[in-house]
Design a protein with these regions (language model features):
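HhH-family (HhH-GPD) DNA N-glycosylase catalytic core used in base-excision repair
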Residues: 1-209
Length: 209
C-alpha cells in the first residue's frame, strides 16, 4: 500500500490526509447486500434507522436475521418495508441460502463471474455489486465501476483527460483502497465525513447517484 503512494502523488496526499484509514467492511457479503437494499434511493440516516430496527426487532445478538429467518419474516408479513425493499431483501436472503453471498465463494471466482452472479439477484445492480465486492468481501483490488462521484473526483484531481481505468493502473493491487480514499476525501470536503463519524455509521456513498 505505501508503494501505491510512491507511484501516485495524489494517492500519497490522500494517504497523508487520512493516516491509517481503511475501507469500512461489512461482516459478510450478505450484510453488505442487505445494506445495499436498505440504502437504495434512501438517505443514509433513514437507511441506518431501518437497519437498526431490523436488527432490534428481528435479529439476534446484535446481528441481522439469518437469511432463512429474514425470508420467513417478510413472507409472513411480520416485516414491512417501504417500496420494493421487502421483495429485494427476500431475493438477497434466497441468494445467501443458495451460497452466492459468501466471502470465500465470491473471492474464489474471477471478478467478472462474481459480478455476473451478483447481478442475477433481484434488486442488486451495478452500484450494489461494487459495494458487495469491496465492502462485503473486503477485497483490496476491486475497482468500482458505478461510482459516478469517484469519476468526478478523478477528474477534479487528475484533470479532465484522466479516466478511472487509466489512473487506477498505478493503484494495483490496492485499487479498492485507493478508490475509497478518494471518495472519503470528497466526502470530507462535502462535510459528510464528520457526520458519519459522529453517528457511528459507515461512510458510504449517497445512494441517490
Amino acid at each position: 500500500w505505501p508503494a501505491v503512494g510512491a507511484r501516485d502523488p495524489i494517492i500519497a496526499a490522500a494517504q497523508a490526509a487520512l493516516p491509517g484509514f481503511r475501507p469500512c467492511g461489512f461482516h459478510s457479503p450478505y450484510e453488505a447486500a442487505c445494506w445495499a437494499v436498505l440504502s437504495q434511493r434512501t438517505r443514509v440516516p433513514i437507511a441506518a434507522q431501518l437497519r437498526r430496527e431490523l436488527i432490534t426487532n428481528h435479529g439476534t445478538g446484535g446481528m441481522l436475521p439469518a437469511p432463512k429467518t429474514l425470508h420467513q419474516k417478510i413472507t409472513s408479513g411480520q416485516l414491512e418495508l417501504p417500496g420494493r425493499k421487502a421483495e429485494y431483501l427476500c431475493a438477497v436472503a434466497d441468494a445467501a441460502v443458495d451460497g452466492i453471498l459468501t466471502g470465500p465463494q465470491l473471492r474464489a471466482v474471477p471478478e467478472e463471474t462474481a459480478r455476473e452472479q451478483l447481478l442475477t439477484i433481484t434488486g442488486i445492480g451495478p452500484f450494489a455489486t461494487d459495494l458487495i465486492l469491496i465492502r462485503g468481501t473486503n477485497a483490496t483490488d476491486i475497482l468500482p465501476r458505478a461510482e459516478r462521484r469517484l469519476d468526478h473526483e478523478i477528474t477534479h484531481l487528475y484533470g479532465p483527460e484522466a479516466t478511472r481505468d487509466t489512473v487506477s493502473e498505478a493503484w494495483r493491487p490496492f485499487r479498492s483502497w485507493a478508490a475509497v480514499h478518494l471518495r472519503a476525501g470528497r466526502e470530507g470536503r462535502e462535510g459528510r465525513m464528520h457526520d458519519c463519524l459522529q453517528s457511528g455509521q459507515p461512510l458510504v456513498p449517497d445512494r441517490r447517484l
